[in-house]
Design a protein with these regions (language model features):
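Active-site-proximal cap/lid insertion segments
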Residues: 1-113, 122-130, 175, 179-183, ...
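Short, solvent-exposed turn/loop segments enriched in Gly/Ser/Thr/Pro and often Arg
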Residues: 65-71, 77-79, 132, 154-158, ...
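Secretory-pathway/luminal and periplasmic proteins that interact with or process carbohydrate-rich
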Residues: 71-74, 143-147
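Generic recognition of well-ordered alpha-helical segments
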Residues: 90, 111-122, 135, 139, ...
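Conserved hydrophobic/aromatic beta-strand scaffold that supports enzyme active sites
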Residues: 94, 163-165, 188
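WW-domain-binding short linear motifs
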Residues: 147-154
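Short, surface-exposed beta-strand/loop micro-motifs that present aromatic residues
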Residues: 162-167, 172-177
Length: 258
């Protein structure tokens, strides 16, 4: 939707063999490859499950499926992973095994660094003291909904500070300070009402005609709406506190350095 700050490397232009444009044909082709990858992963997991069954070890095995990041593939007019929208930031996390009720879903938040601790817990192994993650075992066994109520995200590609994001409950804030300060944006989303983080651009008549999707009025960036000034203030303060807690060396144009 706007040049969000990777001036030295636009993956769909500069990287040979990746993507040549954001045309409809390119997006359709890349989506087809994405779906093919998903189908292949499903087949490979199936082979593992069948092998465990034959070995008689399926009921004694924990299977964890996750990934390091997603990819836009046309969503928000982007092609790569250089963003903090849900399609690229949120990754799958599926677990099966002894003591984990099938068909259940937890709403809680976690980082990938929270995977090793529950693996140790479930296997009866002491968690190394150097590990910074939290154990998801109470969530996996249905004792808790979450171990974290706040998630923090950062992307520093291109000019600094780049992008930062924070999520709490249904609310999510994304800030951009890129392209040597020429792009400075703030986005606020209610993910319950706007799970795909749709923008005002998605409400354009030509976009609606092409996609067949008619977004609701609240499915936009709420940061510019005075009605949500309290939510914006709370999320801005939360983002700054997370940046300080994690010793982020950068600040955005409207944040104090203290």
């Amino acid at each position: 939707p706007f040049p969000d700050g990777h001036p030295g490397l636009r993956d769909e232009v500069r990287v040979p063999g990746v993507m040549t444009s954001r045309s409809e044909a390119t997006v359709r082709n890349e989506l087809g490859r994405e779906y093919a990858c998903i189908e292949n992963i499903d087949d490979q997991v199936g082979l593992v499950v069948e092998k465990l069954k034959k070995m008689g070890e399926l009921e004694n095995t924990y299977i964890i499926y996750t990934a390091d990041h997603g990819i836009a593939v046309g969503r928000h007019g982007l092609m790569g992973k250089q963003n903090l929208y849900e399609h690229s930031w949120r990754v799958p996390f599926i677990v099966s095994g002894p003591g984990i009720k099938s068909g259940t879903r937890a709403k809680g938040n976690n980082y990938l660094l929270d995977i090793l601790p529950p693996v140790c817990d479930l296997a009866g192994i002491a968690i190394p003291k150097t590990v910074q993650g939290k154990s998801l075992k109470p969530v996996l066994e249905g004792e808790k909904e979450q171990i974290r109520n706040v998630l923090y995200g950062a992307y520093c590609g291109g000019t600094k500070p780049g992008m930062r994001s924070v999520r709490k409950g249904d609310w999510k804030l994304i800030k951009y300070d890129t392209m040597d300060g020429t792009v400075r944006r703030t986005q606020l989303f209610n993910l319950k009402e706007n799970p795909h983080e749709l923008l005002i651009e998605h409400q354009a008549k030509d976009v609606i005609a092409k996609t067949g999707n008619s977004p609701r009025k609240k499915q936009v960036n709420l940061a510019v709406n005075p009605q949500y000034k309290d939510e914006l203030k709370e999320m801005e303060e939360l983002l700054l506190s997370e940046m300080k807690r994690l010793n982020d060396p950068y600040r955005f144009w409207d944040q104090p350095f203290k």
